Amino acid sequence: MVTSFGGIRLGAGPCTRRRLAFVQRWRGQDEIPTDWGRCVVTIGVFDGVHRGHQELINHAVKTGRSRGVPTVVMTFDPHPMEVVFPGSHPAQLTTLTRRAELVEELGVDVFLVMPFTSDFMKLTPERYVHELLVERLHVVEVVVGENFTFGKKAAGNVALLRKAGERFGFAVDSMTLISEVSATDRDETVTFSSTYIRSCVDAGDVVAAAEALGRPHRVEGVVVRGDGRGKVLGFPTANVAPPMYSAIPADGVYAAWFTVLGHGPIAGSVIPGERYQAAVSVGTNPTFSGRTRTVEAFVLDTTADLYGQHVAVDFVAKLRGQEKFDKVDDLVEQMGRDTDHARTLLSR
């Protein structure tokens, strides 16, 4: 069976009881092959695939290799909070496709997306373990964080999972969450979590977010037509339209890396896959009485027609907050200073 998510094809493909020759992507338990053998599984939403997630997944991969079996990362779509609390939409640190890419870079064999439906939400912990982990995935070991919960009303925890493992013959390894001194406040110790990173992004603290992620926070989107004002002012910008509910940094101007993610030809000097220095404005353009919140990237030292391109903006540092200027000339001068500042930061 073959399906797709996020524009990427998924296929069950052949399976073995050893590590697989290539990464497989499955959606739903129906795509788990009927002859699937034993495996190591780690479970979580993994939004952001931050350093805590990376340590968990790396440990699962190492365990799978030592046991000579594939490693499966099981995640969920949509975010469980959207189903448990209808109307809620946690800001998304990574798209599902980006999540898969980041997870696969860590050496896993299978990326399994379980549709988080109202029926799935109602699974008791006992059914969750028996029907999914034991009967379908044939787990030999489950690797989770120490705060892991599962099943209806999150009634299952690590202790219950261990008891189930004793009954069904699989091991459970729970890992301590990562805590470090804050990158921006040396007097504060923080525990890396998706919630913490969302709060950093929301506050515009992209340095702290990057410290927890292990890389700059990325916003992806398609370049759409704006009002063309940047070009008139001498700073033509790519207006990036991210997916709904993306985690967008606080209003302000940022130094960032800009990358076109597609592979087709582009009219101009921008090469797909190459990253370019950029000064990025997030906000409503108050100088011109704007109301719509936008992400506008001025890509340094390039000329290109980017309309319709799928791009990524990796936020490195906040240069200043959003300001309203009385004169357009004052804005233009500040944009020049922002560009110089971004270039200096990104050239280090």
Labelled PLM ranges:
Residues 33-95, 101:
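N-terminal catalytic cores of NTP/NDP-binding nucleotidyl/phosphoryl-transfer enzymes
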Residues 82-168:
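N-terminal Rossmann-like or analogous alpha/beta NTP/dinucleotide-binding catalytic cores
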Residues 2-40:
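Positively charged, low-complexity intrinsically disordered leader regions
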Residues 2-3, 9, 15, 226-348:
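Phosphate/ribose-recognition catalytic cores of enzymes acting on nucleotide-derived substrates
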Residues 24-26, 111-113, 171-175:
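General small-molecule cofactor/ligand-binding pocket signal
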Residues 50, 103, 142, 209, ...:
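Residue-level signal for inorganic ion chemistry
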Residues 165-281:
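Glycine-rich, Lys/Arg-enriched anion-binding loops that position phosphate/diphosphate groups
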